[in-house]
């Protein structure tokens, strides 16, 4: 099996097991996140016999399409602010279930859905496990900001909070200029190196206090469980 096939198999195993072990029989509202592993979670949820009995809330355009493609009922967070359970991926997870999210540029809506859920379950493959955030995810902490504040925030992240490097995320070949989020904001990626487990919450709060910051990609005290598909075909589970 190629390394790519092995990773995809790991993602599917983790997502299916997470849905099978956590999906409430009486669920009415489900959060569906974004990312490559959530594709399999949505697929598994779409196989449920009672899929017409609950509403699914997306975290962005991609997850909205996943909900539609799997024949699930689509709702909005405005209509259904109380969510029974949410499934989402992560860019990196530490042993305390702190997360870095936002590599796919949907972090505000992902955090809104996670914060609205009674239970939040993360699905990922073995590459996303780390002893500390920033250990394997080297792109930095994603930060969603109001567009005209980007110069000042970049300055303050570096001078006040000690970021080693801060980049305004660009659209690359697909788009000239910065990436625009689903909320019409910009994204920064701030490199703080490896973040000590005890400092994740403090760093999130410090960033949030900067004028113009909408949300950070640091998710702390939110996830209840994380499922990781392993290289050997097993699934490991971290829980709080």
Curated annotation (Swiss-Prot):
The record marks 88 as: Plays a direct or indirect catalytic role. One of its GO terms (cellular component) is cytoplasm. Involved in the first step of the non-oxidative branch of the pentose phosphate pathway. It catalyzes the reversible conversion of ribose-5-phosphate to ribulose 5-phosphate. Gene3D superfamilies: 3.30.70.260, 3.40.50.1360. GO terms for molecular function: ribose-5-phosphate isomerase activity. GO terms for biological process: D-ribose metabolic process; pentose-phosphate shunt, non-oxidative branch; pyridoxine biosynthetic process. It is an enzyme of class 5 (isomerase). The active site is at residue 110. InterPro entries: NagB/RpiA_transferase-like, Ribose5P_isomerase_type_A. It is found in: Cytoplasm. PANTHER family: RIBOSE-5-PHOSPHATE ISOMERASE. This is Ribose-5-phosphate isomerase. Its main location: cytoplasm. Pfam families: Rib_5-P_isom_A. It comes from Candida albicans (strain SC5314 / ATCC MYA-2876) (Yeast). SUPFAM superfamilies: D-ribose-5-phosphate isomerase (RpiA), lid domain, NagB/RpiA/CoA transferase-like. Pathway: Carbohydrate degradation; pentose phosphate pathway; D-ribose 5-phosphate from D-ribulose 5-phosphate (non-oxidative stage): step 1/1.
């Amino acid at each position: 099996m190629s390394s790519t096939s092995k990773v995809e198999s790991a993602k599917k195993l983790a997502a299916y097991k997470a849905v099978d072990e956590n999906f409430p029989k009486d669920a009415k509202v489900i959060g569906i996140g974004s990312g490559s592993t959530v594709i399999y979670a949505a697929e598994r949820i779409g196989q449920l016999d009672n899929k017409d009995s609950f509403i699914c809330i997306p975290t962005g355009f991609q997850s909205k399409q996943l909900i539609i493609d799997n024949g699930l009922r689509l709702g909005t967070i405005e209509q259904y602010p109380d969510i029974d359970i949410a499934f989402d991926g992560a860019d990196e997870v530490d042993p305390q279930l702190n997360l870095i999210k936002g590599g796919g540029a949907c972090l505000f809506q992902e955090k809104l859905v996670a914060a609205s859920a009674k239970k939040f379950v993360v699905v990922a493959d073995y590459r996303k496990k780390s002893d500390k955030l920033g250990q394997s995810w080297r792109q930095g902490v994603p930060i969603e900001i109001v567009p005209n504040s980007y110069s000042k925030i970049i300055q303050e992240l570096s001078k006040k909070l000690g970021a080693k490097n801060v980049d305004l995320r660009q659209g690359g070949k697909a788009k000239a200029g910065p990436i625009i989020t689903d909320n019409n904001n910009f994204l920064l990626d701030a490199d703080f190196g490896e973040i000590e487990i005890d400092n994740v919450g403090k760093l999130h709060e410090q960033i949030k206090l900067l004028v113009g910051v909408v949300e950070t990609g640091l998710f702390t005290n939110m996830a209840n469980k994380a499922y990781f598909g392993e290289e050997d075909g097993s699934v490991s589970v971290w829980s709080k």
